[in-house]
Amino acid sequence: MKILVALVLALALATASCSPATEPTRSVATPGEWLEFEGSWNAAGNRRTIPLGGDRRGSIINLKGTMLLAGPGRPGTGFRSEVIALVDSAAGLLGRSVWTDERGDQVFSELTGEGTAAKNHITGTILGGTGRYAGVTGSYDFSWRFVIEAEDGSIQGSALGLKGRVRLGQQSAGGTRP
């Protein structure tokens, strides 16, 4: 009898240990609740620069890449990202960004920052979105590090310390998040 009980327990443990792990459940956001996220952002594109006297330069940058977000408050997991920005080496950066998820739903944001090699802290203000991101608001910040800056204007880089928070709109608050 003891052998039979031990055999049943061993079989139950073996079965439980071989079953797939389940992802922790996430609560659905309530309207007005702030959700925090962090992530990585890598992009490549081009930059056109003009001299503005002395060491000052003006640039237009166009970047496309991928953004992956983590954390229980992330608005989505993966996005295609696009950025256009005007950078003045003395005055900073002003730009716009669009994140597009796998469904085609988008998040729009305004980028502002120091935008210089010595001080490159950038802040994004989420202005809204489409589909499940309709009515979304929030902010995020990061520092940008260029990995490639070629003479022909080709650039490639990544965000360091990307963190933010979002408040989902009424329409998207009751929906599901990936």
Residue map of PLM features:
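Sec-dependent signal peptide recognition
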Residues: 2-8
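Beta-strand-enriched cores of mature, soluble protein domains
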Residues: 20-178
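C-terminal motif of bacterial Sec signal peptides marking the signal peptidase cleavage site
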Residues: 14-17
